[in-house]
Amino acid sequence: MSIFYSFSALRGLAMGIFSPIWILYLISKDYDFLQIGLMGAVLEIAKLIFEVPSGVFADRYGIKISIASSFFFSILTWAFFPFIDSAAICILAMIIWALSDSLISGSFETWMSRVAGEDRFGKEMMKNTQLLITFLIIGSIASGYLYSLNIYFPFLLVMVIYLLLFIWMSVFIKVPSVSETNHGDQNQHDSIKIIKESLKIIFNKKRVLLIVIAGFFTATAYDTISRYWQPFLSDLGFSEKSLGYIFALGGFTALVLLTLTIRFEKKIEKNPYLALTSLDSMGMVMTFLLSRAFRPLGIPCTAFLLAIEDIHHPIVTSYLNKFFPDSYKNTLFSLNSGVGAIGEILSGVIFGIISAAFGLSAMFVVVAVFLLIPIILYTIVPKIKDNDMKVQIEKSQQV
């Protein structure tokens, strides 16, 4: 599993460097809140367009090509960033960024599930997230300092990290193929069949469907928070360096929560709904408190909200992995991400308009109310009884 740990460390370092400052960089280039929201919407619309085709691409042509391509497009994304004074260049950067995210979305998890096996997958996913966050903290602490030295230097450094990952993945890494039993039907490589079978699994498995729908609302809420926390805290008087430290504190909070999650992994595996309900209930409370614009609450509330999505993702991914056959896994994870991308598109448009018209405080109140919907869905899911669709699909492939 060491290769996954190394990849997670480098990806976390890159994310830690650009995440705290890229919105501030847009503001420094005279983009207002509505324009930032619309650029975010462009990013998410492009993700939605690319999500399912990229999953099918990975299922047909292999995980290695998909992940290596993701790193290549990440290099291009951050190469364009210093030139986003032009709206056209900014839109192009958002589209390439979306393609990069879509190509690795689901592929990394599928690769890990093949190596770790279903029994160890959930725990290994959390360990990798833990390591990613550790290096995200390191990157975010350095981010504000690097940005204050030169606003372009952080993006150059991120390019170098993704270049290393691209060379490593392209030249030195071997990815295990899907088992032979899942290759018995040559038609499985037909893109339309892959999508049809994947949709059949989601719609016939009501528990999976409701978790995916809940993901739409959580993606909408947490994407809005991640997009607007920087200008919100900046308006409260926090400096650029302080924002980097707050982002690092969010990473540290996620690290602590992940450590607890790993410790209680077996209990969470038995009842993931309780864990998700607890997380989003706390998220709703913290978002409402943040909306009060009380400076002392800004740091702890933001840190916790930044941490939630990092805990959310491995719990949901581990849960869905149980129902996804390996031959369609990339596409299924991409479909789930695609639903989240729809929520993030609406986040950029709807909450961009709300923030421009009524201010960021009012917008965060609406976000808090939005989180009530997935909490309700989590109480419904355990009451639903479904047949094991994954077993049925895999048996049909062996015939």
Swiss-Prot record:
Subcellular location: Cell membrane
Lineage: Bacteria, Bacillati, Bacillota, Bacilli, Bacillales
Bilayer topology: Multi-pass membrane protein
Database matches in InterPro entries: MFS (IPR011701), MFS_DHA3_Transporter (IPR053160), MFS_dom (IPR020846), MFS_trans_sf (IPR036259)
Keywords noted in UniProt: Cell membrane, Membrane, Transmembrane, Transmembrane helix, Transport
Coiled-coil intervals: none
Any one Pfam family match given in the protein's UniProt record, by short name: MFS_1
Molecular-function GO terms, alphabetical: transmembrane transporter activity
GO CC, alphabetical: plasma membrane
UniProt-listed PROSITE patterns: MFS
The organism's place on the tree of life at top rank: Bacteria
The protein's name in its UniProt record: Uncharacterized MFS-type transporter YxaM
Record-annotated membrane-spanning stretches: 7-27, 33-53, 79-99, 131-151, 153-173, 208-228, 242-262, 296-316, 335-355, 357-377
PANTHER family in the record: PERMEASE, MAJOR FACILITATOR SUPERFAMILY-RELATED, TRANSPORT PROTEIN-RELATED
Keyword Cell cycle: no
Main location: membrane
Homology family: Belongs to the major facilitator superfamily. Drug:H(+) antiporter-3 (DHA3) (TC 2.A.1.21) family.
